[in-house]
UniProtKB/Swiss-Prot annotation:
Function: Catalyzes the conversion of urocanate to 4-imidazolone-5-propionate.
Stated name of the protein: Urocanate hydratase
Pathway: Amino-acid degradation; L-histidine degradation into L-glutamate; N-formimidoyl-L-glutamate from L-histidine: step 2/3
Known EC number: 4.2.1.49
Coiled-coil residue spans: none
InterPro entries reported in the protein's UniProt record: Urocanase (IPR055351), Urocanase-like (IPR023637), Urocanase_C (IPR035401), Urocanase_central_sf (IPR038364), Urocanase_CS (IPR023636), Urocanase_N (IPR035400), Urocanase_Rossmann-like (IPR035085), Urocanase_sf (IPR036190)
Similarity comment: family membership: Belongs to the urocanase family.
Cofactor binding remark: Binds 1 NAD(+) per subunit.
Binding site for NAD(+): 54-55, 132, 178-180, 198, 203, 244-245, 265-269, 275-276, 324, 494
The species this protein was found in: Photorhabdus laumondii subsp. laumondii (strain DSM 15139 / CIP 105565 / TT01)
A single MF term (Gene Ontology): urocanate hydratase activity
Reaction catalyzed: 4-imidazolone-5-propanoate = trans-urocanate + H2O
This protein's UniProt keywords: Cytoplasm, Histidine metabolism, Lyase, NAD
Active site: C412
Length: 559
């Protein structure tokens, strides 16, 4: 079986449910179930090719590697650690019971060679795998994983631009993949209508089926008629439109249409695999990506130019426009749009104050498969954080509107101090039997202290340290030392090869005293690195938070 052919398998994968173990302990059962859950057809964008989300973000290098990972996890002891190199299981080593059970490194290249061209050569030879962020680190939970972050972004945009009220307003965006698919629901929850352009009908069908988008328009005229009707009625309805953003946005400009917010979440970070050139069919795009990759990349970037130029015109008209972290500005800049960065990224514009307090995407998954376990943890979050009415509102909306994909899961943005409190409480719920099986807690790599990405999470840092990637390396090392159950270190997630480095962690709450000790360390230290990183850069909010939380930052005399 060749490296390429072993990427394809027509099979449905579903993680085990219940309390029956297939591995030797919950510490190894958890990564096994979460890897399988990443590839559940309810979760993954293209499970047959091991693609979870984000263009070609995969969970394992090929099907042979997947099989061997599962086989190895089933036999792994609680004092051993499995090493994963770009989706391939390469070694098992004796460590100790408080060490991670799995250590993962995905897509990492020496900086000079950190380009899509070199990566694609390696990938074609079966020597590399693009892990995106949570695809190759086995903690993807479907579009819910980004819904609250997108919701928080839209809410903050409404606060800054429309006096905190998006009723009667509408968002223009594109991309309904694993990440972009969160946009329509997030806009609805924030009170706005949205027009969501997507070039693949299958993705629109997926979002309609899972309740992330409300309706599909038959063409642009129909979409605009619906937008006008719903905004006049003050209804927050999301509309999908099958088409190409590089064609539709310029047409909207020509017609003089004025959205209230404009952004984009196409997979522009990967022009070879993630952005359809205008006037091409998807089938033609995929065929020519194999036969004429340089031609495809050129055509995709040329279309991105049209897309970005339209976004710039909207901005010049006074409409709030922002990059949602897919590196489309960079792609357009590289082929001649010198002012591509005139519109800002979402992190410095709307999210950074949260990062300064270690607040970010805290997520957990019920390994039992029982939705009641999630509903019980929702109630526990409200009990332990009684004064955070914004968070309570989010949890209520999530329960009402968000469909679980695969194993039941929840996301909520909480910060330093809160994460450890919640994790320890969940562990006690497992110990007491209130929850029917262990919980895993993880996060997106998009977090306060775990990523260096100058065109996204670390854009426009106040001290100019945007590209310093020591921070995610330190985050991964500290989470390993603290006893996370698995730790990952990736390159290129979100924005593509050469533009980011980032780390992830997952910890198991199995109800034991040993788990409680690990949880206390990991869920304090992990967000604390974000406060440290921002305090070191000079953000006063972060410095104050560090002092308030008793962090020992020697150069800042915080203790």
């Amino acid at each position: 079986m060749t490296a390429q052919n072993s990427k394809f398998r027509s099979v449905g994968i579903r993680a085990p449910r219940g309390t029956q173990l297939t591995a030797k302990s919950w510490l190894t059962e958890a990564p096994l179930r979460m890897l399988m859950n990443n590839l559940d057809p309810e979760v993954a964008e293209n499970s047959y090719e091991l693609v979870v989300y984000g263009g070609i973000g995969r969970a394992a290098r090929n099907w042979e590697c997947y099989d061997k990972i599962i086989e190895t996890l089933k036999e792994l002891e609680d004092d051993e650690t499995l090493l994963i190199q770009s989706g391939k299981p390469v070694g098992v080593f004796k460590t100790h019971s408080n060490a991670p059970r799995v250590l993962i490194a995905n897509s990492n290249l020496v900086p000079h060679w950190a380009t899509w061209e070199h990566f694609n050569e390696l990938d074609a030879k079966g020597l590399a795998m693009y892990g995106q962020m949570t695809a190759g680190s086995w903690i993807y939970i479907g579009s819910q994983g980004i819904v609250q972050g997108t919701y928080e972004t839209f809410v903050e945009a409404g606060r800054q631009h429309y006096n905190g009220n998006l009723q009667g307003r509408w968002v223009l965006t594109a991309g309904l993949g694993g990440m972009g698919g969160a946009q329509p629901l997030a806009a609805t929850l924030a009170g706005a209508c949205s027009l969501n352009i997507e070039c693949q009908q299958s993705r629109i069908d997926f979002r309609l089926r899972t309740g992330y988008v409300d309706e599909q328009a038959k063409d642009l005229d129909d979409a605009l008629t619906r937008i006008e009707k719903y905004t006049q009625e003050g209804k927050a309805i999301s509309i999908a439109l099958c088409g190409n953003a590089a064609e539709i946005l310029p047409e909207l400009v020509r017609r003089g249409v004025r959205p209230d917010l404009v952004t984009d979440q196409t997979s522009a970070h990967d022009p070879l695999n993630g952005y359809l050139p205008k006037n091409w069919s998807w089938e033609e795009y995929r065929q020519r990506a194999i036969s004429a990759p340089e031609e495809v990349i050129k055509a995709a970037k040329s279309s991105m130019v049209e897309h970005v130029k339209a976004m710039l015109i909207f901005q010049q008209q006074g409409i709030p426009v922002f990059d949602y972290g897919n590196n489309i500005r960079q792609m357009a800049y590289e082929v001649g749009v010198e002012n591509a960065f005139d519109f800002p990224g979402f992190v410095p514009t709307y999210i950074r104050p949260l990062f300064c307090r270690g607040i970010g995407p805290f997520r957990w998954v019920a390994l039992s498969g029982d939705p009641q376990d999630i509903y019980k943890t929702d109630a526990k979050v409200k009990e332990l954080l009684p004064d955070d009415q914004h968070l309570h509102h989010w949890l209520d909306m999530a329960r009402e509107r968000i469909s679980f994909q695969g194993l039941p899961a929840r996301i909520c943005w909480v910060g330093l101090g809160q994460r450890a409190k919640l994790g320890l409480a969940f562990n006690e719920m497992v110990r007491s039997g209130e929850l029917s099986a262990p919980i895993v807690i993880g996060r997106d790599h998009l977090d306060s202290g775990s990523v260096a990405s100058p065109n996204r999470e670390t854009e426009s840092m106040c001290d100019g340290s945007d590209a310093v990637s020591d921070w995610p390396l330190l985050n991964a090392l500290l989470n390993t030392a603290s006893g996370a159950t698995w730790v990952s270190l990736h390159h290129g997630g979100g924005v593509g090869m050469g533009f980011s480095q980032h780390a992830g962690m997952v910890i198991v709450c199995d109800g034991t005293d040993e788990a409680a000790e690990r949880i206390a360390r990991v869920l304090h230290n992990d967000p604390a690195t974000g406060v440290m990183r921002h305090a070191d850069a000079g953000y006063e909010i972060a410095i104050h938070c560090a002092k308030e939380q008793g962090l020992d930052l020697p150069m800042l005399n915080t203790k």
